[in-house]
Amino acid sequence: SVMDNNGLEYATGVAKGVSNVGNISGDVPTYVISDDLRAKFELKGFAASLNPTDPTDAALYPGKEGYTYGAKNNLKLIDMVGLDYNDPKWDLLLDELKLSEMHQLFNKSGWGSLAVESVGKPKTYEYDAPHGIANFLTDAVIYSYPCATMTAATWSQDVQRIYGNAIGEDAIASNTEGWYAPGINIHRTPFGARNYEYYSEDAVLTGLCSAAVCAGVEAHGMHAYIKHFVMNDADTNRAANGCVAVWGTEQATREIYLKPFQYSIQKGGAQGIMLTMCRVGWQFTFGSYPLMSAICRNEWGWHGCYITDYTTTMKGAGADQYLAAGGTLIHATAEQSLSDVKSGWCRKLLREAVHQILYLSLIHI
């Protein structure tokens, strides 16, 4: 038993010979990266996103002459209800917006997206907290629920669906359109600072739990922003010193770390993703075209909205990288400007981001 052979002391005492900053032997390993890899850490803007297109290609990214702004097509957002994402009528609606309105929708979406009078889009409200809606802007009464790790221990998708339904009911009562949850990163160590937000160390269990919660939430008209995409397994230096860099093989990334997000989208209908502040390899996750567009949008067929709350980098080159990767919303209450909103590539990708925002606001009507 734990009481034999000093078991209690071993279980509760301080480990010997372990450095606070080292590995279990107390040693601190040193790794040296190549000059080529080091140079990649210095990339900024469009180039850092690894978007495979050429931002100077005028045929792909025309200038002002390639777009219409402020058109009078007599359409409102409500007229789009029930239309497919690729319905050509969306272009007529998007033609009614001004470039400045598109820019603001993209870069000023803290705790919800702005109203757009020209197309009759109302303001929306979105809140944080993985175990209930942390509504701090109104007097609405909402509830807190057991943590994800506890509910995962039930091994019950029925429990998770009830959980999602309950939070969905709270959303209706509190006029909430978006929820920055559930948290679906993988437990890598018992010392993980946010383990209580995440379900388990198993990708399938985590994915099935999250999918059931998302299905319940989305059925009530609120959007789940599953987080943190992706490989957010440490909070130390996650946003400091250039951000912690997490490394993994493609097989491990797909089979373990991406799997819960795939389940949540394809089985649970999740319409939102909140990104991490870390890097995967050398690249910021909030500015990774391979992750955000090649996998989620192109492979999984997802038309939902990304949001990043790493606002300290969302000015100029940081915002450029995010938009070029496929980003949609910046969680900021102060404007975070692109370096050149009038450039051809910014015009086209802003239009696509706004298309996603407007589509999301109608998908459950």
Whereabouts are the PLM-identified features?
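Glycoside hydrolase catalytic-domain context in secreted enzymes
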Residues: 1-363
